[in-house]
């Protein structure tokens, strides 16, 4: 369906198991292009009607539960790692892991990292599943790699509202695995 694993089978199973009649979909900007395809798939494979949130979405702390309360039985929130928060509407988080092969890009990256020996590796939810592979590749090429973590993040993960996982890593350089400017800018400013 896309460059990301939208885990549609899991979504369909959850909707059918819950018996949800109306489902709200929420996406961060980079994944909104998938909204209509996903909505059509859900409506064709479940008895549910889908409402797509067009509001900006900046993270797991920005679920549209207050806006959708009373209108939907379930929210499917794409692109973020769940936080230990209480939501007004049952919410299913789909992290939307990237399907991209980063090997060729890592080879190019290695050239730019030539002058650095200790690298802090950071990413967003979409690439967390690749971190061990990337770390191994860099270490196999003579680099020392550090992964930080903090409360409410996984190892190597930064959130748009929480960059503390990169604190005190004592790295010479930060290697961000992801797309866009938002998270790298936050890393730079932190």
Please state what every model-predicted region is.
Residues 1-190:
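An N-terminal assembly and electron-transfer interface module characteristic of large anaerobic redox
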């Amino acid at each position: 369906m896309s460059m990301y694993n939208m885990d549609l089978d899991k979504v369909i199973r959850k909707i059918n198991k819950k018996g949800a009649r109306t489902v709200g979909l929420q996406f961060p900007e980079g994944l909104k292009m998938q909204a209509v395809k996903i909505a059509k798939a859900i409506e064709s494979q479940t008895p549910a009607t889908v409402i797509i949130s067009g509001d900006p979405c900046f993270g797991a702390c920005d679920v549209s539960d207050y806006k959708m309360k009373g209108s939907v039985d379930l929210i499917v929130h794409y692109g973020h790692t769940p936080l230990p928060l209480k939501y007004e509407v049952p919410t299913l988080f789909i992290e939307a892991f990237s399907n991209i092969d980063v090997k060729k890009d890592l080879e190019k990256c290695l050239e730019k990292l030539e002058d650095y020996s200790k690298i802090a590796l950071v990413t967003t939810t979409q690439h967390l599943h690749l971190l061990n592979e990337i770390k191994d590749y860099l270490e196999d090429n003579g680099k020392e790699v550090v992964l930080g973590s903090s409360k409410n993040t996984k190892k190597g993960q930064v959130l748009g509202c929480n960059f503390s996982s990169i604190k005190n890593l004592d790295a010479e350089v930060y290697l961000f695995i992801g797309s866009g400017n938002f998270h790298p800018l936050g890393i730079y400013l932190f």
